[in-house]
Amino acid sequence: TDAAMTDYDWVLVYDEFPRTPVGTIRNETEPLLCPPDQTILITVEPPSIKIYSRAYPSQFGTVLTTHSIRDLPHPGHTLGRGCLEWLYIKPMQEILDQKEFPKTKMLSTICSAKQHTHTMHKKRYDLTRYLADRLPELDWFGHGIREIENKTVAMDDYKYHLCVENHLEPHHWTEKLSDAFVAMTLPFYAGDPLATECFPQESFIPIPLDNPQKALEIIRKAMEDGEYEKRLPAIREARRLVLEKYNMFAQTAAVIHNHRETGTIRP
């Protein structure tokens, strides 16, 4: 939290060092003042967007990542699902204290106008466009579409939220899903096929990315049947899991705790 600190036990790097000098960091380099095995790298982008050189992660004791061990070989490779910055921005205490979630609108999504073909952006956009043309209740937000500064605007009032990942791979889900749970929405989700390893099966509704007509049928039926109200207990449990387990700070703490149990920490 303080780049000028020189008395620390651990170093945590979120993707990369700052490119501009800050604190003791110069030329994207930090003189290490703790044991090398007490360093953690959190990767941010999936392998379809960013490939890390072997040299960079090899400097860290642990890598929290959704990259496969094949894409990012490292002796401290640790599956880090949900280790991303939230874009749903409220004071943490307010999020923890909130018990009631009044919903006055039906369906929203956040999808930018990006249509890159080397990632899933094009398919994501095409699916969203197809659904928006056929679902008048769908409010579409996103860069180049309808700008917002905070996801709360696009989630707090809505029962349902369309979530489509930009990269489809087992174990890779992002804040697109977790932010929806924090806002107590029921996600229509196109993404990680193993998301039920983390969250209750009833807490989200899978939709096919490559079959827009089928996705439309699933969404319409769910809203007509009142699935939001039926699934509230599962959504609440998914929200609890995000707040207590599947977030950057909880998983970083778990790495440090496991190290304390098995390794050595500087006094």
Enumerate the predicted regions with their spans.
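Catalytic toxin/effector domains delivered as secreted proteins or via bacterial secretion systems
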Residues: E45
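Pol beta-like nucleotidyltransferase catalytic core
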Residues: T1-I42, Y52-G144, I148-P267
